[in-house]
């Protein structure tokens, strides 16, 4: 509805009513205009009517939605199912062109605009979350692992001699396989135990750089967000090493946007040293479906190079999901979620601490990890290994997702590399433990229900252990009685034989 349409409507309905409707529409259009002008996340979230109006206006700019369109190419945005078309708000052409994921498509102005706005909003949120000097970023329709691979492949052209990636160990398969998939040899740097925490071995990293030679190292691949007792890598010190030796630095920041501590580490690393790109997951940080990531960095031209490395067009779904989410929340809504996550972390920490003490266990002291917590399972592990894994199974069958039990001595082979003590980020962690994390969107009732179910599971495992111990004791006692009876029989037999002779 434009001005002429409203004027025509005044001949059918009272002009006063039409003008009122026109003003109501203008309030929606005002929000859309501010978004296009500023390219920033609105402070307050939009309602669904504004969002749907905006998406509809964008969609009708794509050629597949033109009323008189005649498509004779091999890819004309045709969709067989109306349900599929509605699911995607009729954005069918995707984003980017064959040479650049950020390029504008001539036949899809609306989808191209959607892509640009989504990238702009995400950049604004990254700054809001703590990385104030980030220069550029883009949404890529791949999860974190493949997005890291794209970064490594972009660096390959800059460093033709390189064949190694230095990687402080974190027991998570996708980030390890991202290096293998890119065709490089991971050089695993074992972590060092400091108290309960597993921290970056900076001396080992620098020694390996000197041993292999900077020209033969593609990059250092560090990590922020991780499962306790591992903590975020020493990003500032690693960034200085990278700057001193002229080595690129790629950071796996999978679920770090929600943590001010992780974002501060990235900001400081870029300030004192070198960070080329940092990658974060969309689903873990923005509560959207799995399948998207954000590649960001402090050098605009390098981030553009990564975008140009992506082959072909790409799905617009992750960009659409995060755009809708951020416009619904607004910057104030996202800030509120970050604040609530911090509060839930403290609450979860206190509740696990109380429960662990009730079972003669303890909450591991990992102050450098702002998201994940770990509780020892020493008393279970002392009896036998099966009790630890049994606890994990019991939690899962009771609909507790996300909690991990980590037994001692687990061995796992990933892409031909064998890791001892897999899941614990080190070969020989002192004890078995259970992980839980306070991620964005967690509510107090989630924590309370988890603690209640964990308590029940621990009681059940302890009860079973006690029963097994009693059974074993009874069996041992029976064997002892049988042995004593046999000895007594032998003594009596010897006595009888002596008397007979």
Swiss-Prot record:
State any GO CC term: cytoplasm
Tell me the segments the record calls region Tetramerization: 1-44
Q: Which residues carry this modification: N6-(pyridoxal phosphate)lysine?
A: 284
Q: What is its EC number?
A: 2.9.1.2
* Binding-site residues for pyridoxal 5'-phosphate, renumbered to this chain: 75
Spell out the residues of the site May act as a substrate filter by repelling compounds with a negatively charged alpha-carboxylate.
74
Q: Which residues carry this modification: Phosphoserine?
A: 14
Q: Does the keyword Transferase apply?
A: yes
Provide the assembly information: Homotetramer formed by a catalytic dimer and a non-catalytic dimer serving as a binding platform that orients tRNASec for catalysis. Each tetramer binds the CCA ends of two tRNAs which point to the active sites of the catalytic dimer.
User: Which family would the database say this protein is a member of?
Assistant: Belongs to the SepSecS family.
Record-given protein name: O-phosphoseryl-tRNA(Sec) selenium transferase
Organism from which the protein derives: Pongo abelii
Q: What is the lineage of its organism?
A: Eukaryota, Metazoa, Chordata, Craniata, Vertebrata
């Amino acid at each position: 509805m434009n001005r002429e349409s409203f004027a025509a409507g005044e001949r059918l309905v009272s002009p006063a009513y039409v003008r009122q409707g026109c003003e109501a529409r203008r309030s929606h259009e005002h929000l859309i205009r501010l978004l296009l002008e500023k390219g920033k996340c609105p402070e307050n979230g939009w309602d669904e009517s504004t969002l749907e109006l905006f998406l509809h206006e964008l969609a009708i700019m794509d050629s597949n939605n033109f009323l008189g369109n005649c498509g004779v190419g091999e890819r004309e945005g045709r969709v067989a199912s109306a349900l599929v078309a509605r699911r995607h708000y009729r954005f069918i052409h995707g984003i980017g062109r064959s040479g650049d994921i950020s390029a504008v498509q001539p036949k899809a102005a609306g989808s191209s605009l959607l892509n640009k706005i989504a990238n702009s909003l995400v950049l604004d949120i990254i700054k809001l979350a703590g990385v104030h000097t980030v220069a550029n970023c883009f949404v890529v329709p791949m999860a974190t692992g493949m997005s890291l691979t794209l970064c490594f492949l972009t660096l390959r052209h800059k460093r033709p001699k390189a064949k190694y990636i230095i990687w402080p160990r974190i027991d998570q398969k996708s980030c390890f396989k991202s290096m293998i998939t890119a065709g490089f040899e991971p050089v695993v740097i074992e972590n060092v135990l400091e108290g309960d925490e597993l921290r970056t071995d900076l001396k080992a990293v620098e020694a390996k750089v000197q041993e292999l030679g900077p020209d033969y190292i593609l990059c250092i691949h560090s990590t922020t967000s991780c499962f306790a007792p591992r903590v975020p890598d020493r990003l500032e010190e690693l960034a200085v090493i990278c700057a001193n030796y002229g080595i690129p630095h790629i950071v796996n920041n999978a679920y770090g946007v929600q943590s001010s501590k992780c974002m501060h580490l990235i900001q400081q690393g870029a300030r004192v040293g070198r960070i080329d790109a940092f990658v974060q997951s969309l689903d873990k940080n923005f509560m959207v479906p799995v399948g998207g990531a954000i590649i960001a960095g402090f050098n605009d031209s390098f981030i553009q190079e990564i975008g140009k490395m992506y082959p072909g067009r790409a799905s617009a779904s992750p960009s659409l999901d995060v755009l809708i989410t951020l416009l619904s929340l607004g910057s104030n809504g996202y800030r509120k979620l970050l604040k609530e996550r911090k509060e839930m972390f403290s609450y979860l920490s206190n509740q696990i601490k109380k429960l662990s003490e009730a079972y003669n266990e303890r909450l591991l002291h990992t102050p450098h990890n702002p998201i994940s917590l770990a509780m020892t399972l020493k008393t279970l592990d002392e009896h036998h290994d099966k009790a630890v894994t049994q606890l994990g199974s019991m939690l899962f069958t009771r609909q507790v997702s996300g909690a991990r039990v980590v037994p001692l001595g687990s061995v796992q082979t990933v892409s031909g590399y064998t890791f001892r003590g897999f899941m614990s980020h080190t070969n020989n962690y002192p004890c078995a433990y259970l992980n839980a994390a306070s991620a964005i969107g967690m509510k107090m009732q989630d924590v309370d229900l988890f603690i209640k179910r964990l308590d029940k599971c621990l009681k059940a495992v302890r009860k079973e252990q006690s029963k097994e111990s009693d059974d074993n004791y009874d069996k041992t006692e029976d064997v002892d009685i049988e042995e004593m009876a046999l000895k007594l029989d032998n003594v009596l037999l010897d006595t009888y034989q002596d008397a007979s002779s």
